[in-house]
């Protein structure tokens, strides 16, 4: 399925994202490098997590 208003992957820049449901939980995954979010309770929550970006952390990395 194609999703509107989804940010490209922060790691590889791929614009293609898939949401997968496993046992009633959902996660978003990059179709390029396969980075993914943690699980959420809905497809909408998984996409919101995907689009949420932080400016950094103690390790200097980017969280999805």
Swiss-Prot record:
Keywords: Antibiotic resistance, Calcium, Endonuclease, Hydrolase, Magnesium, Nuclease, Restriction system, Toxin-antitoxin system. Induction: The sRNA antitoxin RalA probably works by inhibiting translation of the RalR mRNA. The ability of RalA to block the toxicity of RalR relies on a 16-nt sequence which is complementary to a section of the RalR coding region; in the presence of RalA sRNA decreased amounts of RalR protein accumulate with no significant changes in the level of RalR RNA. The keyword Magnesium applies. Its EC number is 3.1.-.-. The keyword RNA-binding does not apply. Disruption phenotype: The single ralR and double ralR-ralA mutant have increased sensitivity to the antibiotic fosfomycin. Its cofactor is Ca(2+); Mg(2+). One of its GO terms (biological process) is DNA restriction-modification system. GO terms for molecular function: double-stranded DNA endonuclease activity. It is an enzyme of class 3 (hydrolase). Toxic component of a type I toxin-antitoxin (TA) system. Upon overexpression inhibits growth and reduces colony-forming units in both the presence and absence of the Rac prophage, cells become filamentous. Has deoxyribonuclease activity (probably endonucleolytic), does not digest RNA. Its toxic effects are neutralized by sRNA antitoxin RalA, which is encoded in trans on the opposite DNA strand. Has RAL-like activity. This protein is encoded on the Rac prophage. This is Endodeoxyribonuclease toxin RalR. It comes from Escherichia coli (strain K12). The gene is ralR.
């Amino acid at each position: 399925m194609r999703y509107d208003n989804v940010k490209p992957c922060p790691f590889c820049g791929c614009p293609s994202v898939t949401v997968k449901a496993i046992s009633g939980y959902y996660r978003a995954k990059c179709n390029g490098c396969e980075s993914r979010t943690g699980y959420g309770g809905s497809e909408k929550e998984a996409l919101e997590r995907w689009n949420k970006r932080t400016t950094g952390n103690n390790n200097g990395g980017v969280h999805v």
